[in-house]
Amino acid sequence: MAVLLGVHVLGLLVLAVLRLVLFVAGHSMLSADSAGKAGLQSLAFLHGLWFDNVIACYILIVPLAVILLSCAIGLRSRLPLVCSVRWMQTLWGVAFAVSAANIPYFLYFFKNINSSIWNWAEYGTTTFGMLFGEASYYPPMLAFIVLLTVFIWASNRWMRRFVMPPPSSRLLVRLPALALGLACIGLCLFGIRGRRGYNPIKVSAAYYCQDPFLNQLGVNPAFNLLTSTLDDFRPENALLHLMDNAEALDRTRAYLKRQGPEDAPLQYELQPADTIKGKRNVVLIFMESMSADFMQAFGQKQCLTPFLDSLYRNSLSFANCYSAGIHTNHGLYATLYSYPALMYRNLMKGSNIPTYSGLPTALREAGYRNLFFMTHESQYDNMNAFLRTNGYDEIYAQENYPKEQVVNSFGVQDDYMYRYALKVLDRFDGKSEPFFATLLSISNHPPYVIPEHFRPKSEDEETQIVEYADWALRLFFDEARKKPWYANTVFVLIGDHGKLVGEAESVNPESYNHVPLMIHVPGGTPQIRREWALQMDVQPTLLGLLGIGARQHNFGVDLNRIKRPCAFYTADNVICARDSSRFYVYEPSTGQEHFYRDGKNADGADSIFSEMRNYLFSMIQSAQYLLQQGKTTVR
């Protein structure tokens, strides 16, 4: 027993070291109220030990049972002990790997590693390249290798020093050891349960203060990955149960002013505004991880995006636009088809691909040729199948580019893809059919590759890559202006999602979802609009401006006709609603609610919060219901 308990303690020490590494690396994420409060911060490590011990007890329970059984039958071999230690070394190695991987994951997403990572599992080569192509991931990998090596060496040394007691065939002599073993197993089972209450330990037990960084620091990454994965397979968690489906749909129809038929309850006829005369080409650019907070227009002190800032001032721009989620597939899905994201689910994946009435289908019906350009492989996130099923005629991806232009697991760099797209679009002389070209950039996503021909001004790699992304966009527009189709084209630029910029002011930092949205018409009148805008609203707003009438069945609104009371969006495990002063966050898996007002924790009794909750719950629940029922197209 002593050997097993020694390995148990040693494993807990290694997890504590990895937690300390995350704390140091993410120290800037501490809220102002928590900074400098060592006592408050130390409680996160205490909670971490609590959660680490749960995983440790899962690892320990089988070796304890093996040793107890060998003692009960009077086995005289060291083999059970050796096998038990090897078992523990293997599973502890997995736990260390998850904790090490959680360091860059948390620093990027401000969330502990969870079941959403399985979405990347089927893209082995791409994911492998992402992991080993980003230099900032090397320190956690090195820490894992060093700590695992030390752990194995120390546990082996501890096992070799242990002297087996002389075997006895008398049961009475073995009874004390058996009693001790049974007691240890009982304590281990209690450790797995984690607490004495009616329910076993859950992630919510780690939340002890108002600082989201400290609250999440106390959660063991392997525990979070395990429980979130198991939750995915539980029937009661397969679907969200925010409110009754009928009530949600009734509320949503009232909010959106829709009275469609039973098989298409949100259907309506979009009335074009015909603001932009003539049938214009459309270029839609998704900017990878482009948080609005990178732009000086939104308070950024460094000059990272001079071109975007200039374009923002000379376009129809929306200051309060929010992404549907925090992953690229969410941004594509919401912007192109006007449906909200459903937490961390990738709604473009699956062999049974649903069909949608979206921007590509509406433009195709209006006589457009639809093209999609991406930097990586077309199979990633099931894009090729999903996009071709839902309105796109041509897909250009890594398979189309020269191999020497591929720089990492996500394919070519932005400026190459932009130049390639311009060559493809050269076949449109302005006299033939109009085109709708969608370009998905990638550079502002790890692993970062800054080309040698670009000279950034900032010092940090994460800001240098933003400078490069902006520079590549300028290059695209400089070349596009020389094309005969340029003056007859509408350009739409939007962030697919954001990323953490600056400090984390809440459990779900605003910079993850606050994205720039610009509709640029050469020669048009610039305007900055400040009403709430969502990625879902791009389709109806753009069609209205283009003068294209279309039957719609989705959650988007024409921002020139309808104003939303607030913004709503998701971020993996939470759903959120935001107005000018309030921010509401709900975690369906735990039922936890967070209320903020003017950036500070607030009382949820405010009636406005209740209205925001109803708006949020109605939209998300209705979207899930319509998708479940296959009611995603016009009738």
Where are these regions (language model features)?
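Transmembrane and membrane-interface helices of multi-pass
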Residues: 1-236
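Generic structural signal of hydrophobic/aromatic residues within well-ordered alpha-helices
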Residues: 42-45, 65, 127-131, 226, ...
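Surface-exposed, active-site-proximal loop segments in enzymatic domains
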Residues: 72, 239, 452-454
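Short alpha-helical "patches" and their helix-cap loops
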Residues: 78-79, 236-247, 348-352, 556-557
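The feature marks either
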Residues: 123-126, 207, 211, 218-223, ...
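Long, well-ordered, tryptophan-enriched scaffold segments
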Residues: 137-142, 146, 246-257, 387
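Solvent-exposed soluble domains appended to multi-pass membrane proteins
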Residues: 256-635
